[in-house]
Amino acid sequence: MGLPWYRVHTVVLNDPGRLLSVHIMHTALVAGWAGSMALYELAVFDPSDPVLDPMWRQGMFVIPFMTRLGITNSWGGWNITGGTITNPGLWSYEGVAGAHIVFSGLCFLAAIWHWVYWDLEIFCDERTGKPSLDLPKIFGIHLFLSGVACFGFGAFHVTGLYGPGIWVSDPYGLTGKVQPVNPAWGVEGFDPFVPGGIASHHIAAGTLGILAGLFHLSVRPPQRLYKGLRMGNIETVLSSSIAAVFFAAFVVAGTMWYGSATTPIELFGPTRYQWDQGYFQQEIYRRVSAGLAENQSVSEAWSKIPEKLAFYDYIGNNPAKGGLFRAGSMDNGDGIAVGWLGHPVFRNKEGRELFVRRMPTFFETFPVVLVDGDGIVRADVPFRRAESKYSVEQVGVTVEFYGGELNGVSYSDPATVKKYARRAQLGEIFELDRATLKSDGVFRSSPRGWFTFGHASFALLFFFGHIWHGARTLFRDVFAGIDPDLDAQVEFGAFQKLGDPTTKRQAV
């Protein structure tokens, strides 16, 4: 046939049987990848420390998606929250992976069957005997079925009526677990961080889809609309389908990057905005202040801060710190977190408490500056010693740790104080194991960053695909040079533009 690579899909343009076949094969490839990727991740995943080495630090991509839908147990005898289990049941991580692979195999066989048996009666128009698809009717069927699936997910799976529920956590990602969710029918259901909105929106959208599907099954489109939107052309279907996909990709890129109830930080890691706004730092200080108000000592108040909360307040977990083209998990970057060293409190020789100014997201290096409670600079690590006025040595800065492994330990040696001041720029201080994975010390992004980048990139690509195929289907007659209303019998090749006698070719 000699088709160029970018036109090979035209072979299924007027062949409904094989058009169906290639779509089934595509589904087989997607399901097969999902199942295989899940098995690979399970083979390399270490579930032993869900606090300091969670799935998102290890670069897991499909495990978080299974977990948010209610899968928490493994046939390996472990639970995602760190416990051990004896009866994981069929729908474990491995069970879901296996189901995808079996489904992929069945789709593969179905695709081959439909490729071989492409000339089925169901695809024939009984009036003409030629292959033909009733596209508005097919649209109605698909809309109805997707509406049923959408409604069923919201009404049964999410609510726990028939299913496990979904992953729900507190605003600081500390108490997450799978639980049933009641639909939120009030205005709170529009808050992207309210899990109840997931149930209510699926129920509402599913109901709308069912009704719209029934409408399109029972009502034929007007002839002018049918012709105007080229509803008989399969490329119209391609164009509008691409539009639906790129729109969805843009939406999920946003919900992933900015955060929502559908992308819990326990499964995908924190967002960059939580670092930018000092979200976890404020909560830590609030808890410490509450502890001090209850007459706890400073050491006791800091010791009650959950290690999980402290770990979120560390710049190495910020998805915007990893370069887009740095391959590997966060653990391959700064290392595997082993333990919290505690919160460093710096003081000058007058006893005034000093705070290290934190590194903004998009800086690789940042000057070490210590300010007091009023934001006035009191100490720093100078670039040029000859002009320094606030150096750690001159100001006499000391550091004392509260909570964590160094609780109660203090240092006055300037070199040690400067070391911890530099590390305090990056948030709470953790001991990191860089030997096990030969980590290079360069920050990596989390699956939150990869997902966003991938979906935003493909959404942009698919947006152009929608414009391209939409233009092709709407202006097909212009591009082909054939007037769709042309009734006269014309000879191909006689004119430069088909049927236009003013463009008669010159005899050679």
From Swiss-Prot:
Gene3D superfamilies: Photosystem II CP47 reaction center protein. It is a multi-pass membrane protein. The keyword Transmembrane applies. Binds multiple chlorophylls. PSII binds additional chlorophylls, carotenoids and specific lipids. Pfam families: PSII (PF00421). GO terms for molecular function: chlorophyll binding; electron transporter, transferring electrons within the cyclic electron transport pathway of photosynthesis activity. GO terms for cellular component: chloroplast thylakoid membrane; photosystem II. Keywords: Chlorophyll, Chloroplast, Chromophore, Membrane, Photosynthesis, Photosystem II, Plastid, Thylakoid, Transmembrane, Transmembrane helix. GO terms for biological process: photosynthetic electron transport in photosystem II. It comes from the Eukaryota. The chain crosses the membrane at residues 21-36, 101-115, 140-156, 203-218, 237-252, 457-472. InterPro entries: PS_antenna-like, PS_II_antenna-like_sf, PSII_PsbB. It is found in: Plastid, Chloroplast thylakoid membrane. NCBIfam families: PS_II_CP47. Belongs to the PsbB/PsbC family. PsbB subfamily. One of the components of the core complex of photosystem II (PSII). It binds chlorophyll and helps catalyze the primary light-induced photochemical processes of PSII. PSII is a light-driven water:plastoquinone oxidoreductase, using light energy to abstract electrons from H(2)O, generating O(2) and a proton gradient subsequently used for ATP formation. PSII is composed of 1 copy each of membrane proteins PsbA, PsbB, PsbC, PsbD, PsbE, PsbF, PsbH, PsbI, PsbJ, PsbK, PsbL, PsbM, PsbT, PsbX, PsbY, PsbZ, Psb30/Ycf12, at least 3 peripheral proteins of the oxygen-evolving complex and a large number of cofactors. It forms dimeric complexes. This is Photosystem II CP47 reaction center protein. The lineage of its organism: Eukaryota, Viridiplantae, Streptophyta, Embryophyta, Tracheophyta.
